[in-house]
Amino acid sequence: MNPHAGIRDNAGATRNGPMFAASCIAFVATAMIFAIRSDILGDLSTQFHLTKAQLGWVILGAFWGFTITVFVGGQLCDLVGMRALVGLAFLGHVAGLLMTIFANGYTMFAAGTLLIGFADGFLEAVVNPLVSTIYPDRKTEKLNALHAWWPGGAVMGSVLAYALTKADQPWQVKQAVALVPVLVYGFMFLRLRLPRTERVQSGISTRRMYQEALKPFFILWFACMWLTAATELGPNQWIAEILKHTATKSGILVLAWITLTMAVGRLFAGPVVRKLSPIGLLAASAAASGAGLLALSYAHSAPTAYAASFVFAVGVCYFWPTMLGVTSERFPVGGAFLLGLMGAAGNASAGLAQPLMGFFYDTYGPARALRYVAVLPGLLVLVFGGLFMRDLAKGGYKVVKLGGQEPPPQGRA
């Protein structure tokens, strides 16, 4: 056995636990920042005299900052090591939050938002290949479990933001709350020794890693990531603000409901993945998310908003982690690079969706802004449905293993 692969032996479960736990807390931190920012959009617009479209461009900085660093970090992960990238993420989160809290103008606010985006990207560049490496036979399942803590953290952030609003606390206090999980994940990772990635352990060359990105199936998969991310993260950053004007003044609680539903769905993704296959799950998710968005655009009361948001949440909850899981299972030669590339695509898409959402909001009103996004999951139903049928015709979904036998096909008819 490779001396660096000790994390895969029977004793590995004990060593894997702290690494997985630290990764989960890191996701809680990024999600709390996201959720609290959703709650304070109106305050930020007033504080810095911004239109909704201008605010969307500032938020775009967070997504594009993520895009740059998750792409670069996916390649640096094997060169400088995971620990160094976690350190950069921690410093970026602390500095970005402090800049936002003490911003004295638009420029400082925008710079702090961008820095938080950089930190989010470095963190994502580490935790996805880390979990894929320590759980090589359960990638999609464990990535879903990991990413359950993103909506879990968003629930925490949403509820805390709501409570602080009721307590008449300023937006700066709400933003400062996110420093707590940042400090916790920084301390947890500081005490850990992180492994080399699965690709490096398997002796796959860097050249082969880059060549994997040129496969036609991966190019299609890369394109799908743009659509899934825009469907999920485009509306989610705005949904609390939109529903305040269309359905319920407590829009942030609807966001909490969405993220709670997503967390539960991801935690129990394992049986669903084994029953449908990852691609079958994505096809069903696309149909549900499209229906949910349309229903949300017609919701005019709290009960209808909660019902529609449940359908939307069930649809989008599996998108991000399952897209990464399939990338790691079908293109393992691409290693951290392809996972970083997918993360970059997702956040570039989600970032571009922000000013578009702001434009549609300003021009057509809040409800119709959601209606425009519903076109995207409609396209995904066609793509994922076709891929699912192709897999069935070939005997089911198959995982590509590095240096081992393929497990039984999933999702067979």
Which role does the model predict for each range below?
Residues T69-G81, G265-P278, Y361:
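Helix-to-loop junctions at the C-terminal end of transmembrane segments
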Residues G112-A148:
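Cytoplasmic helix-loop-helix junction between adjacent transmembrane helices
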Residues A35, A62-F71, V155, T259-L267, ...:
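Residue-level signature of mid-helix packing/kink "hotspots" within the transmembrane helices
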Residues D137-R138, A145-T197:
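Helix-loop-helix hairpin linking two adjacent transmembrane segments in secondary transporters
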Residues R37-D39, L214-A263, A353-Q354, G358:
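Extracytoplasmic gate region of multi-pass secondary transporters
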Residues I68-T107:
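Conserved MFS/SLC helix-loop-helix module at the cytosolic interface between two early adjacent transmembrane helices
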Residues H49, G81, F102-T107, P136, ...:
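Helix-breaking motifs and short loop linkers at transmembrane-helix boundaries and internal kinks
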Residues P18-L50, P235-A240, A353-M357:
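Extracytoplasmic
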